[in-house]
UniProtKB/Swiss-Prot annotation:
GO terms for cellular component: extracellular region; fungal-type vacuole. It holds the Pfam family CBM_20. This is Glucoamylase P. It comes from Amorphotheca resinae. CDD domains: CBM20_glucoamylase (cd05811). The lineage of its organism: Eukaryota, Fungi, Dikarya, Ascomycota, Pezizomycotina. It is an enzyme of class 3 (hydrolase). SUPFAM superfamilies: Six-hairpin glycosidases, Starch-binding domain-like. The keyword Signal applies. Its main location: secreted. Its EC number is 3.2.1.3. InterPro entries: 6-hairpin_glycosidase_sf (IPR008928), 6hp_glycosidase-like_sf (IPR012341), Carb-bd-like_fold (IPR013784), CBM20 (IPR002044), CBM20_glucoamylase (IPR034836), GH15-like (IPR011613), Glucoamylase (IPR000165), Glucoamylase_SBD (IPR008291). Glycans are attached at residues 200, 427. Substrate binds at residue 149.
Amino acid sequence: MRLLPSSCAGALSLLCSLAIAAPTELKARDLSSFIASERAIALQGALNNIGPDGSAVPGAGAGFVVASPSKANPDYFYTWSRDSALTLKMIIDEFILGNTTLQTIIEQYIHAQAVLQTVSNPSGTFLPDGVGLGEPKFMVDGTRFNGPWGRPQRDGPALRAIALMTYSNWLIKNGQFAEAKTKIWPIIANDLSYVGQYWNQSGFDLWEETYASSFFTIQNQHRALVEGAQLAHDLGVTCTGCDQAPEVLCFLQSFWNGKYIVSNINVNNGRTGLDGNSILGAISTFDIDAYCDSPTLQPCHSQSLANFKVLTDTFRNLYTINAGIPEGQGVAVGRYAEDVYMGGNPWYLITTAAAEFLYDAVAQWKARHVLTVDETSLAFFKDIYPEVTVREYKSGNANSPFAQIMDAVTAYADSYVAIAEKYIPSNGSLSEQFNRDTGTPLSAIDLTWSYAAFITMSQRRAGQYPSSWGSRNALPPPTTCSASSTPGIYTPATAAGAPNVTSSCQVSITFNINATTYYGENLYVIGNSSDLGAWNIADAYPLSASAYTQDRPLWSAAIPLNAGEVISYQYVRQEDCDQPYIYETVNRTLTVPACGGAAVTTDDAWMGPVGSSGNC
């Protein structure tokens, strides 16, 4: 046998190092090279989708994050509060890590969100009760989107507050206390008021499909309130709504069913509840200082690990591209097994989130110098380290069982990144999904969230962790949960550029109309009031068919209108296949009651011609 020399020099040194390196080391080295390259591509991809200078989104306002340049099949050329906040959280973290060129975008986002908070929309108004903060998406110039949608969505305010609190903490540490207090805190305070007031009300989940209580939403709402209480203390101000944090944490425990996390509860939609929602929630509330038995359900928590295994295993035999991949190795991961959107495919952002989840867990175990394996998490560890038993493992030398398990979990995380790498095109562009049978990218191109998710995964793999958000200091949940609420206080953040809107006295008018429609047809109410679009069909108010039945084809919307106003209105049908709108043949009128008057409900029936599907 020919032995390799103990040392090498000159041009042979690289060859020598490669020869000595184990195959797993070479594989990790190759993956590291890919991640470094793709991370730069992903950052530029995200920046290309942010106005006003983003090359892919002409027309986007300053500081507005566009979900994707795609304008058809699907049309994602809008700004979502959730996607925007997650993207800015990534950008703020990159800024804190040293990329100072990003500060202008952060400042533009702050101004854009201050203004956006005050924009009246189909979810409601900003004043007096903040209900409009639950609107999920807007046009790319920051104006209201009036189309039918899954609204409200209650994660946006919490996620925006988290992003802005991260930046505020940096400002405080860098001698800019006044900037954080006078300019940014008022935006944060509005969002935290919304969370404290509405956390216990259902809303649509992050996939905009299920009206329920969402794990991802509740987990981020709790973090926002805990972090908000600490920031308020540091700034010497009051956090309205932050007192609700223990109740939110109490409710968070309701999602565990003994085997896995049910991502949406208080709903019966025929699904198992296994959903990428639960992985995304854990990584967005990751705290490097957290204890692994924390009720915040960190990545290293036994329930989170058990859920990770059950969830990812559901996709092993579901997608053709996962065929033959054994347990303990990464697979392409989608939203949920029952998904049919665009054919129900794996998503880049969830596949990289799976890797990030595992990197997070390893970081937490290493920070605590201990790993506790219990019956709940045992199956997760068995897949990647068969010798594992139910016991406590303490950190030791490089050959200790603790170190071996850390290496095994890290390699498992890397295998998810390798799956993403396999199906990312050579130019590094990231769409929303990739085909379950062929791996070909599909759905929205250049998805901003996909780019942001790749970067946050890259940060964790590189050992770059955000500062603690205070999970250790969070008040424990009460013994018995209570569906409580704290009325919010809402004030326009004028120091950040918000208009000084005022609250007029309004009365809720519920527009009910019986109108038989076909699938794909929508109804609007339009009228002389600005809240009803001022007769401009582009600004008409969408009605909801959530209570529609065959016996009663009800379309409805509750709209606050100015007290004493005389309203002229009619209903309009929006046809499919780009067919023209169909207007009623009558004009209706009503008078809004005086200030303090009782709410009014109409009982209308469609009068006029009806449409039919264009069968496109």
